[in-house]
Amino acid sequence: MDRHDFLWLSAVLLSGCGGRKYIRLPAGSIVLALGDSLTAGVGAPRHADYPSRLAEMTGLQVINGGVSGNTSGQALARLPALLRQNPKLVIISIGGNDFLQRQPESATRENIGKMIEMVQAASIPVVLVAVPRPTVGALLGMPSDHPLYGDLAKRYNVLLLKGVWAEILGDERLKSDAVHANAEGYRRFAEKMADFLRKQGII
């Protein structure tokens, strides 16, 4: 293991105020975006998905690990192979299909928890993305995050990007259908993610 790799294995350090401080990602660093159709970019033209837009905005090499229709269990099964690409950051945005299929919440929590554990075992920082839950409010155009994401972020002490998918999917101008963004919606998500990573000192 060389010095550069050692620094990345020690990327998350305690700051003086008791929070978490992240070593800045060099340009061209590999980032894995793991998810479902919202990551794959369903509802927008090719290369208008949020990982592509995030790469354009940041200079990072963002791998689109989104597969339309994937549940948390299916994404978990794909994760080991994706981690072999040696990402320096993993973004996890998954769970919408679990909710639509009414899978047990306990199973979704367990699967996402296992993903986080797997990534943390490789000493890679995680950004967990909150996904809206199917409620009457969502049907009326006012989606809100499922609380399990906040719970998991606290349990595993990982970064949480909250409210962004809910905001986008609650705006008719930013979505292609009830559960997918359009090109502008994915651009907006990438912009919010880039701003979030800058505020955390990651880029």
What are these regions (language model features)?
Residues R3-R20:
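N-terminal export signals
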Residues H4, G18, G28-I30, T58, ...:
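Catalytic-site microenvironment of enzymes
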Residues G18-N86:
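Serine-esterase "nucleophile elbow" of acetyl-processing enzymes
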